[in-house]
Amino acid sequence: MRDGDPNRRLQVTLGIQFDEAGDLPKLLKSYCVQNGQFAMQISPYLAKLNTGNDAATVLSPSQRFRDLLRNAGADPVMQRLQKEMFKATSWDPALRWAKARKFALPLSFLIVADSFLQSNQMLSRLTQRVRVALPVTSQADEKNWVTGYTKIRNAWLKAAGGAMAASSYRTECYLRLIARGDWDLTSDVVMNGNRIPLREA
């Protein structure tokens, strides 16, 4: 995929968070250090991660490397490391950002967390365009801010074109939840055709 790389070149991605231009090298180095099941096979590829030219990384055409990542995905060591890195790089910073601005609604936290997951931050060029003061002083202000931000982010993604525009299914999903008034996330989330249960049966 080209998504996530500043030069829009082809690169290897793992899951929804890890790519060669981002945290994939760090994840795989940690996996090898902790002697994951496929560490010995993956280790020789570490030096080649995020190398190449403006069109593609060296590893993007490697079916062998992609197969190794798929196999490693079933390893409990890899699963644990992914959860730990997601918590450290996306979830925890998102919670701090939202709480500092007095957000309290589950959907607000989800939307902020998704922004950190995709952009590693709440982009100031988007947040500064929302016409509601922060920190919010009421639940109504919170809803208005999050609604305005999500609409702005949705338009920004669509205008970007390519893989960024294709990722607007995320913001479209959140706008549907907002339109339904499901700020407490009482129902399943349907994103990009996939149903994600948020409550235990």
Q: What are the residue ranges of the model-derived segments?
A:
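Long, repeat-rich segments with strong aromatic
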Residues: 93, 98-110, 116-126, 141, ...
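Generic marker of "main functional regions" within proteins
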Residues: 28, 38-41, 96, 122-127, ...
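Acidic, aromatic-lined catalytic clefts of primarily extracellular/periplasmic carbohydrate-active enzymes
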Residues: 1-111, 184, 191, 197-200
